[in-house]
Design a protein with these regions (language model features):
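Alpha-helical transmembrane segments of integral membrane proteins
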Residues: 27-30, 56-60, 161-171
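Membrane-interfacial catalytic/cofactor-binding modules of polytopic membrane enzymes
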Residues: 74-156
Length: 211
């Protein structure tokens, strides 16, 4: 698979096993679990502190979110937690990546989240996966993409404290997408690029939108 050719190894397979220490695992899970709270916090900040731009900021967030899911309809890529489960970790470790055809049309089984299994945030991630994680929504990473939009909106707000508060959650969220095997590294990179592109495109399209 091209990720192995680009990075020299499979990040989604080796990241968690290399950094399996409980505090690191919990920080990763905390970052991933912070996804929806980040969206809510940015929206609430604009509502209470910059109400004139609340409608614009909300539109940018929601439009970004739904654009990713439209992409997933036309580019159905299975994340590693689903693909590795389907083909077996031994095949992945040996550099063999068999095609699975329409397997994910009828199967949604995934690997358990790697890391410290007794952690509070680990449990939150497992609950989130059970409630809403689906096989073919991996490329680009909407978690990285929409959280990148959140960071740009925090920057746009001019509130340095908001930006600095969100920064560590964003950092660990981006890493966690690969660490917990929800995404391949290339998915996270694509999420960063597309999230930035969506932010500027949607902000340009909504220049005249005010409450």
């Amino acid at each position: 698979m091209y990720k192995r050719q680009v990075f020299g190894f499979q990040p989604a397979l080796t990241f968690a096993s290399t950094f399996s220490w409980a505090p690191i695992s919990e920080l990763m899970s905390m970052g991933y679990a912070a996804y929806y709270p980040m969206i809510g916090l940015v929206a609430f900040y604009y509502f209470f502190a910059r109400y004139k731009e609340f409608e614009r900021a909300s539109f940018v967030l929601l439009a970004s979110f739904f654009i990713y899911y439209i992409v997933f309809i036309f580019v159905p890529v299975a994340g590693p937690t689903f693909y590795f489960k389907a083909v077996g970790l031994e095949n992945i470790a040996n550099g063999f990546f068999p095609a699975v055809g329409t397997y994910f049309n009828t199967h949604q089984e995934c690997l358990p989240t790697p890391g410290y299994v007794d952690g509070f945030f680990y449990d939150l991630v497992e609950q989130a996966k059970a409630a809403g994680e689906r096989p073919t929504a991996a490329f680009p990473s909407s978690h990285v993409g929409v959280s990148t939009v959140c960071m740009w909106l925090a920057y746009h707000s001019g509130n340095r404290r908001l930006l600095l508060f969100l920064a560590p959650f964003y950092f660990f969220l981006c890493l966690a997408t690969v660490y917990i095997q929800a995404h391949y590294a290339i998915d996270a990179i694509a999420g960063l690029i597309t999230g930035t592109a969506l932010y500027f495109a949607l902000m340009y399209a909504t220049k005249g939108l005010k409450c």
